[in-house]
Amino acid sequence: MALRFPRFSQGLAQDPTTRRIWFGIATAHDFESHDDITEERLYQNIFASHFGQLAIIFLWTSGNLFHVAWQGNFESWVQDPLHVRPIAHAIWDPHFGQPAVEAFTRGGALGPVNIAYSGVYQWWYTIGLRTNEDLYTGALFLLFLSAISLIAGWLHLQPKWKPSVSWFKNAESRLNHHLSGLFGVSSLAWTGHLVHVAIPGARGEYVRWNNFLDVLPHPQGLAPLFTGQWNLYAQNPDSSSHLFGTSQGAGTAILTLLGGFHPQTQSLWLTDIAHHHLAIAFIFLVAGHMYRTNFGIGHSMKDLLEAHIPPGGRLGRGHKGLYDTINNSIHFQLGLALASLGVITSLVAQHMYSLPAYAFIAQDFTTQAALYTHHQYIAGFIMTGAFAHGAIFFIRDYNPEQNEDNVLARMLDHKEAIISHLSWASLFLGFHTLGLYVHNDVMLAFGTPEKQILIEPIFAQWIQSAHGKTSYGFDVLLSSTNGPAFNAGRSIWLPGWLNAVNENSNSLFLTIGPGDFLVHHAIALGLHTTTLILVKGALDARGSKLMPDKKDFGYSFPCDGPGRGGTCDISAWDAFYLAVFWMLNTIGWVTFYWHWKHITLWQGNVSQFNESSTYLMGWLRDYLWLNSSQLINGYNPFGTNSLSVWAWMFLFGHLVWATGFMFLISWRGYWQELIETLAWAHERTPLANLIRWRDKPVALSIVQARLVGLAHFSVGYIFTYAAFLIASTSGKFG
C-alpha cells in the first residue's frame, strides 16, 4: 500500500476513489504540502529542479540544431536566405497518400518536410554559423551542457552537497552572483562572440577555433582600448551597400551607434548590437558589486528597505519589514520573478518585429507573425501566474504583525479603493469602446459609412512625431527639421534612426488612425479587466466582506455552501481561473490587431485595415473570414495542398476548445450518475469486465472540472489561432 501514488501524501495514497490520481497530479509540485517536508528540503528540492529544467532546455535546443543539421537545408538557405524556404525537419508519414507527399516536398528537399517558422535559421546565420558541421558542433555542446545540468541537479541532492537554508536566504550574495556572474559575464561573453565571430562572419571572414587567435577583430587590435581612443572602434562602419556575409561594402568598425537597419538584411546593425551588449555587461558587472557580502562593504538589502520611509508619512512605515517578508516567502519571490519575466517576454514580442535583430527575419513574414504571437501568449500565462503566487503568498506566508503599516499592509487596507477604481476603468473602457464599434457597425449596415464616429489618435501620433516620424506634420522635437535634437541626430548619435522611422517598409512606428484608436482601447479594456480580476483575487485572498475567514480555507477551495449567501467564484484560485479567460481574450485582440495590420502592410493594401477595422463586421468579415478561406481549403474533394496540416489543426483546435465547455458548464450530480452507469455497464460486459478499477470512479470536484475545462479551452484556443495565423500568412507570402 505504501507504494501507491502519490508517495508524497499518505492521506491521498489511501483514498479509495479516483480523487487519489487527480489530487496527486494537482499537488505533485506543491512541495510545501507534502508529508514530512522541512524548510530545508523544500529549498533543496526547488534548487535541484532548476537544474532539471536547464537540462530540458539544453536538450530541446540541442534537438533543434541536430534536426536542422540532419534533415534541414541550412547550407543552401545561407546561399539565398530570401528565396529558399528553411526546413525544420522531415515528415515521416504525411497525411494522406501521394498528393500529401508531393505537397510537403519543398524547400529543395528530397521528401516531405516541415518549414521552419521559428526564426532559428536567421538567428544562427546572424551569429556566424554557416555549415551543417557548425550546427552539429552546437548540438553536441548543448547535449554536453544538458548532461552537466542533470549531474549538478543530482549532486545537490546528495547529503554532502546540499546547500543550507542560510545559503538560500543570503540575498546579497545571490544578487551579486546573478547580476555580475550571470547577466554581466554572459553579456560580456556574448559581446566577445559577436566581435570575434559574428561580425567577421557578416564580412565574409570565417572564424573558427583553428584561426580564432590569428584573426584580429579590428585592424588596430587592442591598442585603442589601452590608449583611451575608443572612438576608433566606431570608425569606418559597414556601408549602406554592404552585402551581408561578404566583404563587399564592409567596414572595420566593431562597436557603433549607427541606428536604424542594415539596408539589405532589414535588421539592426551587428556592430550596434555588440555595442549594446558591451554596455549592458558594464552596467551589470558594476551592479553586481554593489551589495554587502563577506567583505563588509556595499549595500545591505535590509538596511536599504528599512530606510525607505517616505517623508510626510503618506505611506506609513514605508518598506519596513519587507526584507524578511520577501526573503522568507518563496511565493513572493516567485511572484516578483514571474511579473518581471512576463513583462520582458511581452517586450521581446514587441521588439522582435519593430527592431529585428536577425538578418533577413523581417522579410520572413510568417516567422515574424509566429514569433510575435508566441511571445505574447507566453507573456500572458506568465503574468497571470505572478498574481496566482501573489495570492498564495497572502494566504500562506503573509504575517500582519511583521508588516504593520508598511506599504504592503496599506495595499490591503485600501484594497476597496484599488478594486473599485479598476472596476470603474474597465466599465468605462468596455462600454465606450463597444459603443463606438457598434455605432459604426449600424452606420455601415444602413449604408451611411460617412456617419461613423472616427477618432484620430492625436496624442499617440504626437508621441510618434516626437520620436522623428514626420508624416503627421506635427513638427515637434525629432520631427522638427530645424531643431537642435534633429541636427545632433544627423551626426552624433544614431544617424540611421530617423531614416528608419520614416521608411515605410519596416514595422517601426506604423502609421496609425481611427481603427488603431478603437482596437487600442479594446485591448486596454482587456488588460484592465484581467488585472482587475487578478488584483482582486490576490488582495481578497485572505478574506473579504462576504467571507472574512478565507485564509483558513486555503488557495483553491470549492463553494462553501449557501450559508454565506453562496461562495462560488470566491477563492483566490477562482479569480485566477476567470482571469485566464480574459487574458486569452485580450491576447486574441492583440494578435488579431498585429496580424491584420501587418498583412495589409506586407500586401501593400493598408487601406483595407484602415477602412474595415473601425467596425466589428469589418474584423469578422475582412480579417477572420477572408483569411481563413485558404486554410479551410487545405484539403477538399479535389485533393491536398501544403496547408492541409494547418486545416486539420484548425479543426482539431476547435474540437478541443469546444470540449472545454463540457467541463465548464456542468452539473456534478449528473456526472456522478453518468460515471456510475458507465462503471455498472462495464462490470457486466464480457471482456470489459476483466478490467477492474482499484479506485472507485467519482465525478470531478468543481475546482478540478474548472481546471480541465480551462486547459481544454486554452489549448484549443491557441491551436486554432496558431493554425489560422501560420496558414493565412504562409499561404499569401510563401
Curated annotation (Swiss-Prot):
Pfam families the record matches: PsaA_PsaB
Subcellular location as annotated: Plastid, Chloroplast thylakoid membrane
Record's bilayer topology term: Multi-pass membrane protein
Single annotated GO MF: chlorophyll binding
Residue numbers binding chlorophyll a B1: 654
GO CC entries: chloroplast thylakoid membrane; photosystem I
Binding site for [4Fe-4S] cluster: 559, 568
Amino-acid positions noted as binding phylloquinone in the UniProt annotation, renumbered to this chain: 671
One Gene Ontology term from the biological process aspect of the record: photosynthesis
Function: PsaA and PsaB bind P700, the primary electron donor of photosystem I (PSI), as well as the electron acceptors A0, A1 and FX. PSI is a plastocyanin-ferredoxin oxidoreductase, converting photonic excitation into a charge separation, which transfers an electron from the donor P700 chlorophyll pair to the spectroscopically characterized acceptors A0, A1, FX, FA and FB in turn. Oxidized P700 is reduced on the lumenal side of the thylakoid membrane by plastocyanin.
Protein name in the entry: Photosystem I P700 chlorophyll a apoprotein A2
Organism: Calycanthus floridus var. glaucus (Eastern sweetshrub)
Classification lineage: Eukaryota, Viridiplantae, Streptophyta, Embryophyta, Tracheophyta
